[in-house]
Curated annotation (Swiss-Prot):
PANTHER family: ATP SYNTHASE, ATP SYNTHASE SUBUNIT BETA, MITOCHONDRIAL. This is ATP synthase subunit beta, chloroplastic. ATP binds at residues 172-179. It comes from Medicago sativa (Alfalfa). It comes from the Eukaryota. GO terms for cellular component: chloroplast thylakoid membrane; mitochondrion; proton-transporting ATP synthase complex. Keywords: ATP synthesis, ATP-binding, CF(1), Chloroplast, Hydrogen ion transport, Ion transport, Membrane, Nucleotide-binding, Plastid, Thylakoid, Translocase, Transport. Signal peptide: none annotated.
Amino acid sequence: MRLTPTTSDTEVSGLEKKNLGRITQIIGPVLDVVFSPGKMPNIYNALIVQGRDTVGQEINVTCEVQQLLGNNRVRAVAMSATDGLKRGMDVIDTGAPLSVPVGGATLGRIFNVLGEPIDNLGPVDTGTTSPIHRSAPAFIQLDTKLSIFETGIKVVDLLAPYRRGGKIGLFGGAGVGKTVLIMELINNIAKAHGGVSVFGGVGERTREGNDLYMEMKESGVINEKNIAESKVALVYGQMNEPPGARMRVGLTALTMAEYFRDVNEQDVLLFIDNIFRFVQAGSEVSALLGRMPSAVGYQPTLGTEMGTLQERITSTKEGSITSIQAVYVPADDLTDPAPATTFAHLDATTVLSRGLASKGIYPAVDPLDSTSTMLQPRIVGEEHYETAQRVKQTLQRYKELQDIIAILGLDELSEEDRLTVARARKIERFLSQPFFVAEVFTGSPGKYVGLAETIRGFKLILSGELDSLPEQAFYLVGNIDEATAKAANL
């Protein structure tokens, strides 16, 4: 049984006999600690700093060993604020990596990076803990089944379908709707999905974390009266936390998800918002640890850090983890090292476009930039594949014609091109959809559209049967029948 870095007196007294060090230097969230010769802690061991600050307030800071410096010194990164720490304070080596509670008792609760509950509902009722650092499953354990994960969102299901047990990235700059899309996916999938979900809030707004918690309580995904019946565990390390916490909170959430997959043999949904903040925190820590920065100031170990996290998010013969990750794109530049490194690990990418958002088309998913390894006729079937390709061709032709339209106007186009433009504009509007989680803002009730309905709708537009309808009829509706009904009222 691994020792968990909690602070009951009996444990601490046992630990004190074990291995004691002393703080020699503090630079922001990074501490240098000196130990007795031959008593050096291992890399990733958890250290606990205890004592009182100058005002007499009790201090209890957990750190993680990152470097062994020689001369019996180690460099560690703090998981909480280092206010009040002084040189010479005692540091206890727990002898093990950070361990967090796992299992059914975590459902319905909110945790911080250390696995401590932060929802004022008392301690977690579990004796099972698991270290946050572990290796990825071996090749032989991996599962290679291919099946589609229906989301009820037209643009996603048709053009960049998600794989069950796959990794999905939502890419977008600031304010184009990544978090709203993640909330909608939680709403559509987590409610209909029989298994459990784990949500990792990595370096995002505390307000959004609070909104999500309240929403989950209202929808019954978290059952307040009987916590054991809840379907989701929440792990938060938000924007105000030190970089150490933001760098490790993704691993805490993943460790909880892995337990449900490996031990309970369940299908798990893992939501991470936002994976870019994990990279950003790693970059802050890397500079403080004295590493030479790499491209655009990122850490030189960017690829390794991302790979270590992503390779653990996978499906085995026991169960699956389907992960949906929001990826912030700095300055809308998809070639930035952070989003570019993330791309390599994903089965499907949903790219959000500022251009579409400014047109008022929500979800602002770029139909030509979004990709999926699942969009193959042998997986999705001929009808789906053909429809998706024809939709993309129509939109691509419209994109090519936009310069001509801007200079010469629509009237200068050939009859065929004018028809293509009209259909493309209808398709563009029909790809929008009212969301359940945005009802309070838009006033229109949310819509879930099944895959068969989605394909039928786009086939009708492409066939020309709906050429007589005005394009406004296709804006923010669910299935195609709603569009024809709306046209009758226009």
